[in-house]
Amino acid sequence: MKPSIVLYKSIPTDLHQRLAQHFTVNSFDGLTPDNQPELLAALQQAEGLIGSGGKIDQDFLQLAPNLRAASTISVGYDNFDVEALSQRGIALMHTPTVLTETVADTMMALMLSTARRVVELAERVKAGEWQESIGDDWFGVDVHHKTIGILGMGRIGMALAQRAHFGFSMPVLYTSRRPHEAAEQRFGARHCSLDTLLAEADFLCITLPMTEQTYHMIGREQLAKIKSSAILINAGRGPVVDEQALIAALQDGTIHAAGLDVFEQEPLPVDSPLLTLRNVVAVPHIGSATHETRYNMAACAVDNLINALTGTVKENCVNPQVLITH
């Protein structure tokens, strides 16, 4: 008899069929067991879980007593209580490599569109307001040869540094727990303190995940140290930045502009002051949102779950210590 799994996000047909070759697949639209009796029943039998989003904590895990593996279609896993999963011997799988290049592309797009005011100016053209050459009050700022400061020199940070260094001749500063030899050799990147990065960067680019250590890492005190001409780009996690402090800094000119793909609350509330600011480019968490990358992420998550439930995991496990007991 095939193991039972719960799939709580739509995936391409061929990937669904691949899961069905190995498991009895119970498909649902999201995780709301209180409102879906069928989901509650499926969770009771499920050995595997695959999807994205949802809150997977102690209370949820009590609904799935037979769960052995969870596979998230994402690189981030802050919605999972990793300690609770580990205590129960449940392997948590994620997709850390397949979205790297696409997220770096998104960050470059935010840098360019924010610096050159692409969204504002495109909206003016569409509104029929382009009647003469624009004045200097609508000019943007250069990206090339400006200094980029990267918070977090992981895979995405490296891909962003590559684009900045080779594509735009940008000096690269970065912060990380330890120096990154490859970044320094390939891109001439300079490892520095957060204070130095804040003071020198023209573009402050955040690629960090959400942890207890990174929560509100960039707040009012840090924003006050940034150049008034600097632009903040966040495609890591929203809560890394104190959003209220950022709003104030954008309103009073403490910093020049911001390009944001992530927010403290998602979807972004319709009454958020960020939506009223001309110096903000806000997009709906699209970092990995291309057809190709989303397919590859789903395929990776499918393979991850198959590997976890068949005892063949070689990579992509957040808590590999649980595999020893399997």
Swiss-Prot record:
Keyword NADP: yes
GO cellular component: cytosol; plasma membrane
EC number(s) on file: 1.1.1.79, 1.1.1.81
Catalysed reaction equations from the record: glycolate + NADP(+) = glyoxylate + NADPH + H(+); (R)-glycerate + NAD(+) = 3-hydroxypyruvate + NADH + H(+); (R)-glycerate + NADP(+) = 3-hydroxypyruvate + NADPH + H(+)
Superkingdom of origin organism: Bacteria
Cellular compartment(s): Cytoplasm
Pfam families per record: 2-Hacid_dh, 2-Hacid_dh_C
Gene3D superfamilies: NAD(P)-binding Rossmann-like Domain
PROSITE patterns: D_2_HYDROXYACID_DH_1
Subunit annotation: Homodimer.
Role noted for this protein: Catalyzes the NADPH-dependent reduction of glyoxylate and hydroxypyruvate into glycolate and glycerate, respectively.
PANTHER family: 2-HYDROXYACID DEHYDROGENASE-RELATED, GLYOXYLATE_HYDROXYPYRUVATE REDUCTASE B
Family: Belongs to the D-isomer specific 2-hydroxyacid dehydrogenase family. GhrB subfamily.
Name by which UniProt lists this protein: Glyoxylate/hydroxypyruvate reductase B
Encoding gene per record: ghrB
